[in-house]
């Protein structure tokens, strides 16, 4: 796992039980999962809009900024649910080299 991701995961974990007025992340945890999910949804939409704008203009700076926000809030969501980013990295590693079609077929229940 990257040093940045490791450090961020540690900070998020520290702030799970911090006073809500001590940081933005602590306030999100205090507001609960629904507020965190709302932020993930908001950042998802902003990322999509930034991608459309980047495709039209060729300028990807806003796309990078919004993607960072989306990743950040997704990490807050995982942490709120007791999950570590390493679990996502492990899942991506598991899928590496596996055909997307084969992976999807393996997930689908038999009819």
Curated annotation (Swiss-Prot):
<dbReference type="Pfam" id="PF01503">
    <property type="entry name" value="PRA-PH"/>
</dbReference>
<keyword id="KW-0368">Histidine biosynthesis</keyword>
<dbReference type="GO" id="GO:0005524">
    <property type="term" value="F:ATP binding"/>
</dbReference>
<dbReference type="InterPro" id="IPR008179">
    <property type="entry name" value="HisE"/>
</dbReference>
<keyword id="KW-0378">Hydrolase</keyword>
<keyword id="KW-0028">Amino-acid biosynthesis</keyword>
<protein>
    <recommendedName>
        <fullName>Phosphoribosyl-ATP pyrophosphatase</fullName>
        <ecNumber>3.6.1.31</ecNumber>
    </recommendedName>
</protein>
<dbReference type="GO" id="GO:0000105">
    <property type="term" value="P:L-histidine biosynthetic process"/>
</dbReference>
<keyword id="KW-0547">Nucleotide-binding</keyword>
<keyword id="KW-0067">ATP-binding</keyword>
<keyword id="KW-0963">Cytoplasm</keyword>
<dbReference type="GO" id="GO:0005737">
    <property type="term" value="C:cytoplasm"/>
</dbReference>
<dbReference type="GO" id="GO:0004636">
    <property type="term" value="F:phosphoribosyl-ATP diphosphatase activity"/>
</dbReference>
<comment type="pathway">
    <text>Amino-acid biosynthesis; L-histidine biosynthesis; L-histidine from 5-phospho-alpha-D-ribose 1-diphosphate: step 2/9.</text>
</comment>
<dbReference type="InterPro" id="IPR021130">
    <property type="entry name" value="PRib-ATP_PPHydrolase-like"/>
</dbReference>
<comment type="similarity">
    <text>Belongs to the PRA-PH family.</text>
</comment>
